[in-house]
Amino acid sequence: MTQSVKDEAKFLDTRLDDETAAVLEKWNLVILGAALLHDADHIRQAIRWRYKIPMQLWIIKLAVYVLPTVAEFLLKNKRASSFLTVAANGIVTSAAFLKVHLFKPTTDIWGAWNYNYFKLAKGVWHEGQFIKGIDWIDWALLLDLPAVAIPACMTAIKKRREFKQNLLEAGEEA
């Protein structure tokens, strides 16, 4: 293992100050809230469409909550590694949501959401059922996620840089 890798591993285990942890936790919870609102909108869509969301889709959707849960655990323990999890959460969640909803999902595991929002707006036949309708609320609750997740990612990167610089100025290894 190179010295730079050892230094980075040591840095990632460094304890955060209360203020930095609070800022990151706020952003992490904002991303989590946006994801929850988006999922609630899917329930609203399913009700509108009279569509029964399959159980496997409920289980798959839990994957969205892995990064914010890990980040929350790291933040509660004030670990510098939370910088990476909050930043990754912002990038991964935004990219995944936009890919699935604006383009085509990579896999056909998404039930009625195997179609992008543009096709769903026009209407599609899915498993013998005609599904149509994407309204402004659907769009807002899709686009609000990257609107908060990208600034969260940028804040995590900025705070990491500041935190590391403060360690260097204090004479500690970063």
Give short role names for the model-derived ranges.
Residues A46-K52, V100-I137:
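Interfacial non-cytosolic loop connecting adjacent transmembrane helices
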